[in-house]
């Protein structure tokens, strides 16, 4: 990953407390996994930022290296990589995702 792309990812994560790198956007997800991720976050009724990786080839390739995670979507809370749609669903079902969001909002 080039330095400029890493800086762009760092800036996105610094600018937004909750970031979902996904295919499409929160109003029009472009794959089933991205749709699942947005539905989970919408259910939590929280403010979050989405970044459409389909519109940016450099970020699409680099985010996988940045997180050491091979798939999209990717959720970050407070700059920390949480996981993809399957992990988000598991954390949501156990209440852990809500707890992480509540801890973030309490700060």
From Swiss-Prot:
<dbReference type="InterPro" id="IPR033658">
    <property type="entry name" value="GRX_PICOT-like"/>
</dbReference>
<dbReference type="Pfam" id="PF00462">
    <property type="entry name" value="Glutaredoxin"/>
</dbReference>
<keyword id="KW-0934">Plastid</keyword>
<keyword id="KW-0676">Redox-active center</keyword>
<keyword id="KW-0479">Metal-binding</keyword>
<feature type="binding site">
    <location>
        <position position="31"/>
    </location>
    <ligand>
        <name>[2Fe-2S] cluster</name>
    </ligand>
</feature>
<dbReference type="GO" id="GO:0005739">
    <property type="term" value="C:mitochondrion"/>
</dbReference>
<dbReference type="GO" id="GO:0051537">
    <property type="term" value="F:2 iron, 2 sulfur cluster binding"/>
</dbReference>
<keyword id="KW-0408">Iron</keyword>
<dbReference type="GO" id="GO:0046872">
    <property type="term" value="F:metal ion binding"/>
</dbReference>
<dbReference type="InterPro" id="IPR036249">
    <property type="entry name" value="Thioredoxin-like_sf"/>
</dbReference>
<feature type="domain" description="Glutaredoxin">
    <location>
        <begin position="6"/>
        <end position="107"/>
    </location>
</feature>
<keyword id="KW-0411">Iron-sulfur</keyword>
<keyword id="KW-0001">2Fe-2S</keyword>
<protein>
    <recommendedName>
        <fullName>Uncharacterized monothiol glutaredoxin ycf64</fullName>
    </recommendedName>
</protein>
<feature type="binding site">
    <location>
        <begin position="85"/>
        <end position="86"/>
    </location>
    <ligand>
        <name>glutathione</name>
    </ligand>
</feature>
<feature type="binding site">
    <location>
        <position position="60"/>
    </location>
    <ligand>
        <name>glutathione</name>
    </ligand>
</feature>
<dbReference type="InterPro" id="IPR002109">
    <property type="entry name" value="Glutaredoxin"/>
</dbReference>
<comment type="similarity">
    <text>Belongs to the glutaredoxin family. Monothiol subfamily.</text>
</comment>
<dbReference type="GO" id="GO:0009507">
    <property type="term" value="C:chloroplast"/>
</dbReference>
<feature type="binding site">
    <location>
        <position position="23"/>
    </location>
    <ligand>
        <name>glutathione</name>
    </ligand>
</feature>
<dbReference type="GO" id="GO:0015036">
    <property type="term" value="F:disulfide oxidoreductase activity"/>
</dbReference>
<keyword id="KW-0150">Chloroplast</keyword>
<dbReference type="InterPro" id="IPR004480">
    <property type="entry name" value="Monothiol_GRX-rel"/>
</dbReference>
<dbReference type="InterPro" id="IPR014434">
    <property type="entry name" value="Monothiol_GRX"/>
</dbReference>
């Amino acid at each position: 990953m080039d330095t400029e792309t890493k800086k762009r990812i760092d800036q996105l994560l610094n600018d937004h407390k909750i970031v979902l790198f996904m295919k499409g956007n929160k109003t029009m997800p472009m794959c089933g996994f991205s749709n699942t991720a947005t539905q989970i976050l919408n259910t939590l009724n929280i403010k979050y930022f989405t970044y459409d990786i389909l519109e940016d080839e450099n970020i699409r390739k680099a985010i996988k290296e940045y997180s050491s995670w091979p798939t999209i979507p990717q959720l970050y809370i407070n700059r920390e990589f949480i996981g993809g749609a399957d992990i988000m669903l598991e954390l949501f079902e156990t209440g852990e995702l809500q707890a992480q969001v509540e801890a973030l909002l309490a700060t």
